[in-house]
Amino acid sequence: MTKRTKKVGVTGKYGVRYGASLRRDVRKIEVQQHSRYQCPFCGRNTVKRTAAGIWCCNGKGCKKVLAGGAWTVTTAAATSARSTIRRLREMVEV
């Protein structure tokens, strides 16, 4: 079976509807939400999205459930908050 879509990828299901720029944005989001991510607990690339904001590690013996962003495991706001908390903890320790 040959590859049917070269440029549009997963948004080929929309055909010519909704406009090219919207389909490009949807493609980026859908690729992010359907890909696998690295588990922060076991380190394997087995974290998959189960529902909006709920991510589950399917690794052997791990099976952890994570709360994250709707389309990706981590969001920009969560990353900045985590770095701020780490910096404040280092200031308190010193």
UniProtKB/Swiss-Prot annotation:
GO terms for biological process: cytoplasmic translation. It comes from the Eukaryota. Component of the ribosome, a large ribonucleoprotein complex responsible for the synthesis of proteins in the cell. The small ribosomal subunit (SSU) binds messenger RNAs (mRNAs) and translates the encoded message by selecting cognate aminoacyl-transfer RNA (tRNA) molecules. The large subunit (LSU) contains the ribosomal catalytic site termed the peptidyl transferase center (PTC), which catalyzes the formation of peptide bonds, thereby polymerizing the amino acids delivered by tRNAs into a polypeptide chain. Keywords: Cytoplasm, Metal-binding, Ribonucleoprotein, Ribosomal protein, Zinc, Zinc-finger. GO terms for cellular component: cytosol; cytosolic large ribosomal subunit. This is Large ribosomal subunit protein eL43A. It comes from Schizosaccharomyces pombe (strain 972 / ATCC 24843). One of its GO terms (molecular function) is structural constituent of ribosome. Component of the large ribosomal subunit (LSU). Mature yeast ribosomes consist of a small (40S) and a large (60S) subunit. The 40S small subunit contains 1 molecule of ribosomal RNA (18S rRNA) and at least 33 different proteins. The large 60S subunit contains 3 rRNA molecules (25S, 5.8S and 5S rRNA) and at least 46 different proteins. Signal peptide: none annotated. InterPro entries: Ribosomal_eL37/eL43, Ribosomal_eL43, Ribosomal_protein_eL43, Ribosomal_zn-bd. A zinc finger (C4-type) spans 39-62. It is found in: Cytoplasm. Belongs to the eukaryotic ribosomal protein eL43 family. There are 2 genes for eL43 in S.pombe.
